[in-house]
């Protein structure tokens, strides 16, 4: 459909994300324990579910993914910290059309356009259940959202902090979406909200979170180039190293090469047309 993907990899998580990382680690550890219990009971369905929940992304997996992308001729950027922040910068700079993510943090980091529910199957697995629901791609324009809400990006960040972000997962006690929006509309910023609403939370810590969203670590040193796929290297990685089905990989490679050549051909035709006009 003419989509040219650019992948962004997470770097080192910021210190202010420690609480969220600890929470996720505990979830994986609990799932791993329940997996072992399910295996002992012979409950294979539950074991499969808990195995998925306990899975961890390793450095080796990330490096393998990068090698495969290089072989496929697809560009990627290694973020120094949060991938969402790096992607938002790339979009804001005009080097990409939109961030594709399920995470609304993309908007807080300043991505001018966010696409959610971008899937091949058009379905999404429901958390903790063997059920799926149909989903349709959703596009959110940051400026349209801000205009509709009547707030600035900084105020959107403050609103999110009140509800809870990856850097303060629990948010402020007894404050939901509606109350958070009302507080921001009335008081304009975190600093001006009466302390009675903040339930003892340190305003300095909350402001630190806001500042991270506004000025996250990013790199400006990246290149975005699409190259012709190296079919032999793709097969070596997938078939020889990871035991993928050779026929399926060959078929996928044919489709990939065809897509690249059609893209390259249209690009060349566009240049030729431009030169003829000028």
Model-derived features with residue positions:
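Noncatalytic, basic helical substrate-engagement surface that gates or grips nucleic-acid strands
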Residues: 1-93, 112-114, 120
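Conserved NTP-donor binding/palm subdomain of two-metal-ion nucleotidyltransferases/polymerases, i.e.
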Residues: 106-109, 120-131, 140-141, 145
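Active-site-adjacent pocket scaffolds in enzyme catalytic domains
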Residues: 109-112, 176
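Residue-level marker for buried hydrophobic side chains located in beta-strands
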Residues: 99-100
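General alpha-helical segment detector with a strong preference for membrane-spanning helices
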Residues: 14, 107-109, 180
């Amino acid at each position: 459909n003419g989509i040219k993907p650019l992948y962004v990899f997470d770097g080192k998580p910021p210190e202010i994300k420690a609480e969220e990382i600890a929470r996720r680690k505990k979830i994986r550890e609990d799932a791993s324990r329940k997996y072992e219990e399910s295996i002992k009971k012979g409950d294979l369905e539950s074991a499969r579910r808990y195995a998925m929940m306990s899975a961890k992304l390793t450095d080796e997996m990330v490096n393998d993914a990068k090698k495969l992308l290089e072989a496929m001729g697809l560009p990627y950027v290694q973020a120094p910290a949060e991938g969402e922040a790096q992607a938002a910068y790339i979009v804001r700079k005009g080097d990409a059309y939109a961030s594709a993510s399920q995470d609304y943090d993309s908007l807080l980091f300043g991505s001018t356009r966010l696409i959610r529910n971008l899937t091949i199957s058009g379905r999404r697995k429901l958390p903790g259940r063997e059920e799926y629901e149909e989903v349709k791609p959703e596009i959110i324009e940051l400026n349209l959202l801000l205009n509709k809400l009547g707030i600035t990006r900084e105020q959107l960040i403050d609103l999110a902090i009140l509800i809870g972000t990856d850097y303060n997962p629990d948010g402020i006690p007894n404050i939901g979406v509606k109350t958070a929006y009302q507080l921001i509309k009335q008081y304009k910023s975190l600093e001006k909200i009466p302390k009675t609403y903040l339930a003892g939370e340190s305003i300095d810590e909350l402001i630190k979170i806001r500042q991270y969203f506004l000025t996250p670590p990013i790199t400006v040193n990246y290149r975005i180039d699409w190259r012709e796929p190296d079919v032999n290297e793709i097969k070596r990685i997938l078939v020889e190293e990871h035991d993928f089905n050779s026929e399926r990989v060959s078929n996928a490679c044919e489709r990939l090469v065809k897509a690249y050549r059609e893209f390259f051909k249209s690009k060349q035709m566009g240049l030729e047309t431009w030169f003829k006009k000028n």
